[in-house]
Regions:
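Short, solvent-exposed amphipathic alpha-helical segments in soluble enzyme
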Residues: 44-47, 70-74
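Switch II (G3) loop of P-loop NTPases
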Residues: 1-42, 47
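Short glycine-/polar-rich loops that comprise or flank the Walker A/P-loop
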Residues: 49-54, 78-82
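C-terminal lobe/tail of nucleotide-utilizing enzymes
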Residues: 72-166
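Conserved Switch II/interswitch segment of TRAFAC-class P-loop GTPases
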Residues: 23-37, 50-71
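Proline-centered helix-kink/hinge sites
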Residues: 7, 33-34, 60, 81, ...
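Helical mechanochemical/support elements of P-loop NTPase systems and associated helical scaffolds
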Residues: 5-12, 32-39, 63-67, 78, ...
Length: 166
């Protein structure tokens, strides 16, 4: 890991955005660390003219309501629409009875639409660790719950920002 202060982070992000040949994109999804620091400020400031919305990715826990409030305030300040929230690592499905087990507890009430709840998935984690996420998703498009939910989420977001089906 590299510990960079604000100006170095900002320059690295701007270099990545401006010096990369992205080709023709319909969408650019940017995965940011939690919080409203330099990374989020730089991305939203630079991409503001084309920013279609923000999706909050949360994990269940007691501090979630506080995190959502901060993120909504940040979105308001930068003039971005919060499209909704995705709850990551929300549950494990029991292989014996299909009951949903929530190892991190329930989410509780948040003032943002929940777009999707994603399960903990050991096969997915293994694919990520081995650098095989794309192959995993392609090979499991119909069989894996996490993959199905990601594709469903993608369709929901396209409908929201474009008003059309994929």
């Amino acid at each position: 890991p590299i510990a960079w202060r604000g100006p170095l982070k900002t320059k690295a992000i701007l270099d990545l955005i401006t010096l990369t040949n992205w080709g023709l994109l319909d969408y650019l999804v940017v995965d940011l660390p939690p919080g409203t620091g330099d990374e989020a400020l730089t991305i939203t400031r630079y991409l503001k003219p084309k920013l279609r919305g923000i999706v909050l990715v949360l994990t269940p826990g007691k501090m979630v309501a506080h995190v959502v409030t901060k993120a909504k305030n940040f979105a308001y300040i930068v003039g971005a629409k919060v499209l909704g929230a995705v709850i990551n690592m929300s549950y494990i499905k029991c292989p014996c009875c299909n009951a949903l087990l929530r190892p991190f507890g329930s989410l509780g009430h948040i003032d943002v639409e929940i777009l999707e709840e994603l399960p903990l998935d050991g096969d997915l984690a293994k694919a990520v660790d081995e650098g095989n996420l794309a192959d995993f998703m392609i090979n499991n498009i119909n069989g894996n719950e996490w993959v199905r939910k990601i594709f469903s989420l993608t369709k929901k977001l396209v409908r929201e920002v474009e008003g059309k089906e994929l």
